[in-house]
Curated annotation (Swiss-Prot):
Record's compositionally biased regions (Polar residues): 31-40, 137-158, 174-192, 325-334, 372-397
Segments of skewed composition (Basic and acidic residues): 292-310, 335-345
Name of encoding gene: SEMG2
Protein name: Semenogelin-2
Subcellular compartments: Secreted
Lineage, broadest ranks: Eukaryota, Metazoa, Chordata, Craniata, Vertebrata
One Gene Ontology term, aspect cellular component: extracellular region
Domain of life where this protein originates: Eukaryota
UniProt signal peptide: 1-23
Amino acid sequence: MKSIILFVLSLVLILEKQAAVMGQKDGSKGQLPSGSSQFPHGQKGQHYFGQKDQQHTKSKGSFSIQHTYHVDINDHDQTRKSQQYDLNALHKVTKSKQHLDGSQQLLNYKQEGRDHDKSEGHFHMIVIHHKGGQAHCGTQNPSQDQGNSPSGKGLSSQYSNTEKRLWVHGLSKEQASASGAQKGRTQGGSQSSYVLQTEELVVNKQQLETKNSHQNKGHYQNVVDVREEHSGKLQTSLHPAHQDRLQHGPKDIFTTQDELLVYNKNQHQTKNLNQDQEHGQKAHKISYQSSRTEERQLNHGEKSVQKDVSKGSISIQTEEKIHGKSQNQVTIHSQDQEHGHKENKMSYQSSSTEERHLNCGEKGIQKGVSKGSISIQTEEQIHGKSQNXVRIPSQAQEYGRKENKIS
């Protein structure tokens, strides 16, 4: 408690001394003439200490009226010099920002040149915006994750007072085919590609914008024609014997175009074309044969129900095409179609579990399950190199199995 009371009293004394000194300083400004040279100039250096040092000096009682007058003049001069220094620093900062902008512009141009050399056939997006006669060009290549994503997405938005035009840029050969891993995982799936390109144009360049629009339309039409031709080749590569009864994946091309037309003073046109193409690069073939049930009547009113569930050959063929190169497929004929009657006849005679009772009123149930061959053929073509087809026939039951008779 005593320490707190002493601290409060010391603060009160300091505040009273400061109030007295400030009152004396205000009263002395009108009394002192311009003869400030009566006091030594060595005292001028003391005003460079902070306000804290001044308060500390005032608390000791060593602060004089004349010294306060010198401090006021020097503070005014120092304030003027500080403002001038701040202006110089601001000017230097402005020059530094301009220098950084110029360096960034050069780096962007260099990056654009390198990316243009490396990205032939890739998607690349150019963002140009003009402000005050200076153009900042940036080039970005969308990342193509060939393991997880079907295509890359590039998106850039720059906002300024000029016009924005969006369109779909040229499709490359790399986009025509995804990676082998992605195709192996998704059979018969669709592959879509979205490329969004933003370009901010100067208002006076109407002819250049119109020319670019026509070029984009022509290139887009060529891409659609190439995709249709590619899909047609894939359809012709299927085997005629299985083509009528196989369930194919999506091979059609679905193209959607959303055009947003925005007109400004010079009637520039803003286009946004979104393209969603589903490529028919895979053929997924599954053939089934229906099960049949035959009932036989044996001697003396006996009934024998023979169920012959013959599952036909399941032929799964996957054809993968990369870089527009196609390879014809060899389709394996189903054994149940070619030799259906023989297999059924043999399965009736040599079924696995057959029960026959020749007595009157007894029933015999014959059940035979014969599974056909399962043929899986996978053909992968990567960069013009094809792999040989693998054919794995598997039969669940032998035809020469003995009959088990239970009386």
